[in-house]
From Swiss-Prot:
<dbReference type="Pfam" id="PF07687">
    <property type="entry name" value="M20_dimer"/>
</dbReference>
<dbReference type="GO" id="GO:0016787">
    <property type="term" value="F:hydrolase activity"/>
</dbReference>
<protein>
    <recommendedName>
        <fullName>Uncharacterized hydrolase SAB1253</fullName>
        <ecNumber>3.-.-.-</ecNumber>
    </recommendedName>
</protein>
<dbReference type="InterPro" id="IPR002933">
    <property type="entry name" value="Peptidase_M20"/>
</dbReference>
<dbReference type="Pfam" id="PF01546">
    <property type="entry name" value="Peptidase_M20"/>
</dbReference>
<dbReference type="InterPro" id="IPR036264">
    <property type="entry name" value="Bact_exopeptidase_dim_dom"/>
</dbReference>
<dbReference type="InterPro" id="IPR017439">
    <property type="entry name" value="Amidohydrolase"/>
</dbReference>
<keyword id="KW-0378">Hydrolase</keyword>
<comment type="similarity">
    <text>Belongs to the peptidase M20 family.</text>
</comment>
<dbReference type="InterPro" id="IPR011650">
    <property type="entry name" value="Peptidase_M20_dimer"/>
</dbReference>
Amino acid sequence: MNELEFVTKHRRHLHQHPELSLHEFETTAYIKAFLDSLNIKYDCPLETGVIAYLEGNDSHTIAYRADIDALPILEENDVPYRSQSDHVMHACGHDGHTTALMLFVQRCKDMQDSGQLPQNVVFIFQPAEETGGGANRLIKAGAFDKYPIEAVFGIHVNPFADEGIAVIRDEEITASATEYRFFLTGLSSHVADKEQGHSCGEALQHVLTQISQIQQFHLNGLKRNIVHIGHFKAGEAINTVPSNGYLEGTIRTYDIDDLTIVKNQMQKIAESVKLLFNVDCEVKFAEGYPPTINSPKLRTQIEDALIKADLNVYDKPTPFLFGEDFSFYGQQLAPAYFVFIGTRNEDKGFVTGLHTSHLNFDEKVLINVVNFYENLLNNYKEV
């Protein structure tokens, strides 16, 4: 089959069989079977995900990463290859990322067989980008200890940019993503004896109001930060004073100082609840993803490789507010660079955003991705 047939076949198979973070068992088996067919050795440091390696003609070692997990979303695309898993969908394009890396593996194996693979290459089929911090898990598991990786590259499909556009930015290209949760515990009573209880209902209203004001009163208005409330609940019945409350959301910032401000304000809010309502309140923060930092030292190589892949380069003036665990590679492993590849095509109706039930794209864009990867490989220079 030709390369367009290759990416169409594999991407649509993966699209039909999406799996959630840390449950990508069939996806992992599919990738392993593909690698076995090429007689390529690989490791599985975690229960899901695969790390493959090909030795080249030089001592330099570079890595390419694709995430393989999906999202708990019911697909609404009316296509023959729609998800066969109820309420699970590749709504972030990871099926495309995985497919592009598979084709690149095949190209690299062909080069190795002919004695023309210029560098050593590590292929990272990474699980759990969406919720499990798979990149950090792999690093902590020692998945890369035996590879002297000098640089890590990755891409993400981007329905906000047209086909043929590559979006880049030095330094921060995505925001940090930190989850927070408030837990409230009061004292229940019948609504007729409301004064006998300690209501988490009113206390939760206070928390909601105060969180909503953090961005307005405590953060620089010229910076794009997000303090988002995603879900909240108080009580169980309409005629009782609620004895419990819960609220959760996410924080997106570009620098550690702003994140510290938000965390400190949330801690003060939690402390104020006890004083005002006699309700115990605790706030907890889940380990988040740091900002993705693109190494400026890799910029020239990235731009040249994109242009040679017939992609028009757009230098984004501000970072995306997405969270992305590719950030851990640049933070802990090696200089890294992350590129967004445009997939928007209004004529074909490919216009909906990431994490939506109608996300779709033309597989031909994946050929551009692989050309970009190969250009990087052929012209890589140590930084």
